[in-house]
Structure formats: structure tokens, C-alpha cells
Curated annotation (Swiss-Prot):
Possesses an unusual extended V-shaped dimeric structure with each monomer consisting of three distinct domains arranged along a curved 'spinal' alpha-helix. The N-terminal catalytic domain specifically recognizes the glutamate moiety of the substrate. The second domain is the NADPH-binding domain, and the third C-terminal domain is responsible for dimerization. Pathway: Porphyrin-containing compound metabolism; protoporphyrin-IX biosynthesis; 5-aminolevulinate from L-glutamyl-tRNA(Glu): step 1/2. The lineage of its organism: Bacteria, Pseudomonadati, Bacteroidota, Cytophagia, Cytophagales. One of its GO terms (biological process) is protoporphyrinogen IX biosynthetic process from glutamate. One of its GO terms (molecular function) is NADP binding. This is Glutamyl-tRNA reductase. Belongs to the glutamyl-tRNA reductase family. Coiled coil: none annotated. The active site is at C52.
Amino acid sequence: MISNFKSISLTYRKAPLEIRERVALNEAECKSLMLRIKDFTDTAELLILSTCNRTEIYYTSNEDYSNDIIKLLGVEKNITGLIQQKEYFEIYNEQADAVLHLFEVGIGLDSQVVGDMQIVNQVKYAYQWSADLNLAGPFLHRLMHTIFFTNKRVVQETAFRDGAASVSYATVELSEELLSATPNANILIVGLGEIGADVCRNFKANTSFKNITLTNRSPLKSEALAAECGIEHVPFETLWEAVAKADLVISSVAKEEPLFTKEEIQKLSILSHKYFIDLSVPRSVDARAEELPGIIVYDIDHIQNRSNEALENRLNAIPHVRKIILDSIVEFNEWSKEMEVSPTINKLKNALEQIRKEELSRFVKQLSDEEAKKVDEITKSIMQKIIKLPVLQLKAACKRGEAETLIDVLNDLFNLDKQPEQIRD
């Protein structure tokens, strides 16, 4: 009997940030939790995906272990009474629902930013961690590779991944365009609001820029983020020295008056161009700065227009994306149904092989080596032809949803319940 595929999901859709932060898991914690679940349940296949927007556990079992898994998650994160917050979790106990959900997550349909490009790699990491612990079996291997192939189709056949659909992504995308002809470009990020932090992380995840510097009035958080992203941190007191070195300045400073005034910028030695991307409201870069030679400023409206256009393209592509997903799920379900009859097919092959070997053993001593070899080949060929039709009929019955009756008939005819699934030598 093939176990049901299920999922427990805590995401931005139902759970506030403070809850998501508490249950978020790193690689070591994901692996530790998978081993806990394996020890306390009968599940054979497990996958845990944890990002800033979701923590999800996928598992195979005919039992509903959602309560147990939530409790084990609480133990892993040292959260007392996590089960009391079960209303924040979505439970997918039907295989069709869990499979569809993982497809939508892996493709980016369920992301807070539709078409999120990071999620594919995050899913790949989760799959790798599962495989590292031998907790990815035939079902999960096939499912994950089907999702990865589906993602390639979505990229090739739709506009779902085109452009940057968030302000932070659009900022990184624009930066790449502006600095494409500038070798070893220097980028300075000023301010650490929510957008500034997202920009830092997106630079780390999606670009090859090496010379990125961060500065902020309050150094504690910015030093930690700089360490997380592997970028340089400089004191805010040295701001203008850093600005002088930068080819691009990205500002998300919360300030009533512009931090970067025309007068201060005018003091800089501008040899060619210096770009400012101003993500602040009110603006932190003086609107008059563009009057200066070599100074080019992009404000939040420009960035927002880029992200809005990309988001509109992605939303328009969703019907096509859903069709591609459904095509893949149909194909996966056909394979999954065939998996249900695989044990019966193996047992039938084993039963026939036993009969063949027993009969051969009665006569082989009377034959020469050459004769024995020929008889062995002939009987193997006969067996393969005998078994071909039942196998084809079983697979056809799978597609019609009628395999159970045929399985029962074969079990009775050949006493398959007593046969092992593996063919013995």
C-alpha cells in the first residue's frame, strides 16, 4: 500500500511575522526535526521547507500526524504549547491537495511576491537535505523532479518570471542595468528599513557584485546584516567618504529633509557618472541633484513602475502557468497510480521466476552447459511474454481507477501475499 502524501503549512497567509519568525528553521534544525519526525512516526519520506514567509512539513503516511508534528516543531524550536496555535497552520491531508500545494509553492504561485525567483533554490535545498538523510524515496524523488521540470517549462513558455515584481528586486535589476559597463562597481546602501534589508539580501542572492558597502545610523542591526550577507559595513560618520567612492548609492533613509543635498553632492569629484536610487518617502536625495553634471537619480516612483509592470505581466501569465502545472500533475498522478501496482507486478514476476527455476532445476542436470544456457534463455523469454499482458492490463486499469480488482484476482491466483517484492537470485 502506497502511503498518502500530506502537508502541514504555516505561511504569511495566516500567520503573522512574529509567529513565522519563531518557527523558522535553518538547515541543521530542518534535519534535526526530520529525524525527530522519523523516530516518532511511521513516515518514510519527509521534506521540510522553511523561509521567511513559510515553514512547511511534507510527509508520507496513511495516518494524520499533524498534531504530533506541530508538537515536535515546538520541541525543536523550544516553543511551549505551539499546538495551541494550530489555527495558524493549514493542514493538507488529501494527497491531491498536498501535491498541488507543493507545485504552487515550488513554482512561485503561492509566494508573497508572485513568481518569487528565490523559492526554486530554497525548494532545491530542502530536497537536498531530505536526500542527505535518506528521507526522499521514489515518490518524493519523482515529485521534486517533476516540479523542477515544470519550473523550466514555466520559465521558457511564459512571462511569469520576467522582470522584478517587488521594489527590492526591481532595485537590484536596475542596478545591474546601470552598472553593466562598470567593472568592479562600488555600491553603497544607506539606511536599513525593511526595503533596505531586502535589497541587501537580494544583492547577495541574485547578483555577482563584489564591492557592496552598508551603512546605517544605528550600527547594531546593520553590522549583523552585513555579516549575514557577506558585505562590508562602515560607520555612518564616514558616509560621505563612502559616497565619494561609490558608483551607485541606494538610499532608504527615513528623514524629513533630504540627506543627500545638492550642495553636499556638488562637493564630490564626479569623473563620469554617479547614480542614486532613492527608495525613501519623503525623498532622501535632493530633487535638484540631477541639475549637477554626471548625477542621475531614480526615485521610488520609477522603481515602483518597473515592479508594477513586471507584476502585471506575471499576473497575466498565471492562467498559462496553472495549465502547465495541471499537465504535470496529470502525468505525475499516472506515474503515482502505476506505483500502486508496482509491488503486485514485482510479486507476480517473482512467483513466475520461482516456478521457472524450480522446473529448470529438475532437468538441468541432464543437460550440457550449452543446452542449459539455451533452455534458460528460452524459458526467460517465455516468462516475459506471459507476464507482459497482465502488466499492461494492470497499468491500463490504473488509469481507469480499476486496478484494485485486478490486484485481488492476481493475489488469489498466484498467492502473491506470501511472495516478496524483490526477485530472488
